């Protein structure tokens, strides 16, 4: 009798666990994961940036874009899903990851550089931090500006080069936001500026540095010409970015929590 009672209790317990597992929770019961973005023009939208109009925006003011509503942006589509919610948007049109953009070297605190503006950024309290940049580094700098791989003892002169700047950025985020998962998004069009994407050197550097820090690198598929206007994602391109990022986040977060 006692044995049957114990078995019955165990079965009820197992059933309760299975019913409350992430796979079986209703949309209203699921944990909402907050995400913060550090990005360039691809992630801007007027009035939605963390510091309002203090950040330069590309969307929707560009005369050539059809992204005329915030609902068309990749990150708003992600915000509209049941699992994720936008925490902070730190995106500045024309910004680079390194301190250098062509012949210009940014000073500490300048928001036009991901690295120099990190200490000034309000990241909120995110569960996820996504880095989506490198495009302006590719468009304005050369392979000579890649620099060497370096993972500690960073100097300000190091941060004028892409590799140490990108490593510093991830290192900073890991140290200052230990409870957040960090993801990097590698732009499409790897191999050349004419495609509106990254040079091979920058794309490969991102992959290597993400591997070093055990950061998930979401590599976007090539966005065809129909998905870009003036080298920037249009509505079609935004859908492609959203679908890839959404799929990668769900897959990676489920795998990591098992």
Annotate each predicted stretch with a short phrase.
Residues 228-258:
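Histidine-centered active-site loop/cap adjacent to the catalytic His
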